[in-house]
């Protein structure tokens, strides 16, 4: 089965892509693709930026990068966000997406 397609683009040293965040989950995890965006569950609630901070921390730990290399450029108060990560290629991002079964 092919990997799902996540739309990505380069912005200088940064890799930009969309994320659909599902807060108040039982654990932090990438669950797949949603309409061309990466779907990620985070345990934190969507209160006072807690889910955004949890998303940044999760991605930083996953890719072994400092948190300063992960930024939310759009969607601070929305479940649909545009995220940029410095220091990775699209192939590395796509390698972390689990196989989706129909």
UniProtKB/Swiss-Prot annotation:
UniProt cross-references to NCBIfam families, sorted A to Z: DUF167 family protein (TIGR00251)
Origin superkingdom: Bacteria
Protein name: UPF0235 protein Swol_0959
InterPro entries documented for this protein: DUF167, YggU-like_sf
Transmembrane segments: none
Pfam family, one: DUF167
GO terms for cellular component: cytoplasm
Matching PANTHER family: UPF0235 PROTEIN C15ORF40 (PTHR13420:SF7)
Gene3D superfamilies for this protein: YggU-like
Family as reported in the entry's similarity comment: Belongs to the UPF0235 family.
């Amino acid at each position: 089965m092919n990997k799902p397609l996540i739309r990505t683009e380069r912005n200088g040293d940064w890799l930009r892509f969309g994320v659909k965040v599902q807060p108040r989950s039982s654990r932090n995890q990438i669950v797949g693709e949603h309409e061309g965006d990466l779907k990620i569950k985070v345990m934190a609630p969507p209160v006072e930026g807690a889910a955004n901070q949890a998303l940044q921390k999760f991605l930083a730990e996953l890719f072994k990068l400092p948190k300063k290399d992960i930024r939310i450029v759009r969607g601070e108060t929305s479940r649909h966000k545009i995220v940029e990560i410095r220091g990775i290629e699209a192939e590395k991002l796509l390698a972390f997406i689990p196989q989706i079964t129909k």
